[in-house]
Structure formats: C-alpha cells, structure tokens
Amino acid sequence: MSLQAIKYFDNQLQIIDQLQLPFVTEYIPIRSAQDGWYAIKEMRVRGAPAIAIVAILSLAVELNEIHTAGKLSSSSEEVGLFIIEKLHYLVTSRPTAVNLADAARKFENMVTEHTRAQDSTGQSLVAAYLKEAELMLVHDLSDNQNIGEYGAKWILERAATQGQNKVNVLTHCNTGSLATAGYGTALGVIRSLHAKNALNRVYCTETRPYNQGARLTAYELVHEKMPATLITDSMAASLLAKSHSKVSAIVVGADRVAANGDTANKIGTYALAVLAKYHGVKFLVAAPRTTIDRGTLTGTEIVIEERAPSEVTTIKGPLQGRVGDTLQMETIQLAATGIDVWNPAFDVTPAALIDAVITEKGVVEKGSDGFFHFDALFEESASS
C-alpha cells in the first residue's frame, strides 16, 4: 500500500514531516496558511504537486477555522481579498515549482468570478473554496495513477522490441507518494511497472545535497518491497555503462516544464539526461499537465532557487543505533570551513535531451520538426 503523506479529513490537515524521514514517521498538523508556508519553505513537504496541495489546503483549514469561530465577514469582496492575499503569500514559499503558482492562479480566478455573482457572500465563497480544494486532492491522485499507466505502457512497448518483458529503470530525487497526493509521477510509473510484474529493478540516486533519494525514495521503495538499489549520484554513468544492469529508461519528475519542453527539476537531472543520451537510454519526464507552463517559452526564463550553503557543507541525521520514537538529530560538518559554496536546488534539462513527457492524458513525444507540442493536451480543458 502506498504511503499517505497528506491527510485531510473533516477540515483538518496533517502531513508527514519529511525532515524526520526515514527514521521517524510523524504527522504534523497544518492549521493555517502560515503553517503551510513554513512547511513548504523548510521542506517538511516537498515535490511540486504536494506543495501546491498543501498550500491550498492550509488556507482551506484557516478559512474553515475563521468561519467556525464566527469571525468570517459576510462580504464576499472582503473575504475574496483575504484569500487572494494569502494565495500570493503562499506562492513565495517555493517559486520554482509551477504547480503552486498555477494552483494559486486558478483559485484566484475562482474567487474573482464568485465575488462577481449577485448572491455571493463570504460564507458561499468559503464553501466554494473548500469544495475546490478537496477536489484538487482527489484529482491529483487520479492523475498520478494515469501517469503511471501511460508511462509503464510506453516503456514496456519499447522494451518488447528488444525481447524484454521486465525492465530496469533509474530515477532521481523523490517523485512518489511523498511528493504528491499519492502514488506519484515518475515513481508512479515505476509503481505501475511493479504492479504489472514488469519491474526487474529500480535504481535510485541519493540526490545530493538534500538526499531526497536516499531518505525518501528509498524509504518508499522499502515500504512497498520493490526490488531497489541505492546509488550515489556520481555512480550513474558507471551503472548505465554496465551491460548487466541494462537500464531501459531514466524516469524523472519535474517542477516546471517550459512550452518548448525544457524541464526544471532537482539538481542533477541535467547530468542524467546527458548520460542517457550518450548511452542510448530513454530519458522520460513524468508530470501532470499543471507542471507544463505554456507561459514560459524556454528554460532560460525559469527562476532557479538557490539554497543555503550549509546543505552542502553539512549533513543531518541521528547517530547510528540511536533511532527511536524520539529523534535526536545531529549535524555533521563535511567540508572545510571557509570554502565558498554554490547550491542551486534545480537545473534545467534541454528539451533536446528528453525523449518523451508522460502526462495524465498520454505520452507526448517530439513532432516531426523535432520539438514538443503540448497544446493538444489542453484542448479538452479549454472546451470543458
């Protein structure tokens, strides 16, 4: 059974504190938009789909609390301004991930339309917000399952031409239940392969410097008893070169996909794409349509978040043999004191290195002109 990283029931929100994984599984309450902002900024929750969901639901919890306490204004205009201000605030917690900004924009549009209605009140606006927020959680899970099915089918069809009915895949960072409402994007593809008894082995990178692969992806893979091997980031080239491993595909997630297919994802993704091209391994991006930013023409326009030098120069964890219900984390220095550090959280993989983008509506490959064209994915949304 997949992990449930986000629990939302009866207007209460809890998330797994990912800073304590894989040593302790603890759910922490999110009671306000401010709680949501800090949970995202401090990376207690991460993954582009998950942070958008937590942001929107954190405000839902706060709105419900205000309403329950009898402090909600009857004016839809006043409540609308409050919601929009909070949405803008939440977007500042993680600027690179397009899902958060996209969700905030959609909810802002919903608020604006609702306040224009003649019978609109503060109470009806909050009710509409809560309904849409809950649907967002449901839709994300369904979308991830579709991504998994489409991606597994695409990989297996190509493996079959090589006489393979089981495949080895490599993934980077964490794109599973801990990064989404459930199931996952890139890890969802791997889950689907495993469910079809078509996964021979998944290799996951440790994903320095924040170690999401070692801490989170490995945690999910062990939890679900998948055949898995952890490697350091710098071992990927040797793995792809080994004939015994025969990696069929590298599958990664995305924080933002530009209109031309350039993809911003966890630092180290670009390097894997270069290695895949050299070794003739398919390189796939798995992401919902909400991650595709048609307003950003190329990857050069994507703002890359830079994080604290301490993430590179130190490492955190409990001392070996001292893991219990109460986690006592230690910080260990790795680097020479005084060394300068550059710590971009993401890099941008050029579309030329990407073989396909897997979405909940299907797999998009490059056209005959050598470019990605995503417009057809959104035609249904525009007409519905």
Swiss-Prot record:
One of its GO terms (cellular component) is nucleus. Its main location: cytoplasm. Pathway: Amino-acid biosynthesis; L-methionine biosynthesis via salvage pathway; L-methionine from S-methyl-5-thio-alpha-D-ribose 1-phosphate: step 1/6. One of its GO terms (biological process) is L-methionine salvage from methylthioadenosine. It catalyses: 5-(methylsulfanyl)-alpha-D-ribose 1-phosphate = 5-(methylsulfanyl)-D-ribulose 1-phosphate. The record marks C173 as: Transition state stabilizer. Its EC number is 5.3.1.23. Gene3D superfamilies: translation initiation factor eif-2b, domain 1, Translation initiation factor eif-2b, domain 2. Coiled coil: none annotated. It is an enzyme of class 5 (isomerase). It is found in: Cytoplasm; Nucleus. Keywords: Amino-acid biosynthesis, Cytoplasm, Isomerase, Methionine biosynthesis, Nucleus. The active site is at D255 (proton donor). One of its GO terms (molecular function) is S-methyl-5-thioribose-1-phosphate isomerase activity. It holds the Pfam family IF-2B. InterPro entries: IF-2B-related (IPR000649), IF-M1Pi (IPR005251), IF_2B-like_C (IPR042529), Initiation_fac_2B_a/b/d (IPR011559), M1Pi_N (IPR027363), NagB/RpiA_transferase-like (IPR037171). The keyword Iron does not apply. It comes from the Eukaryota. Catalyzes the interconversion of methylthioribose-1-phosphate (MTR-1-P) into methylthioribulose-1-phosphate (MTRu-1-P). Belongs to the eIF-2B alpha/beta/delta subunits family. MtnA subfamily. This is Methylthioribose-1-phosphate isomerase. The gene is mri1.
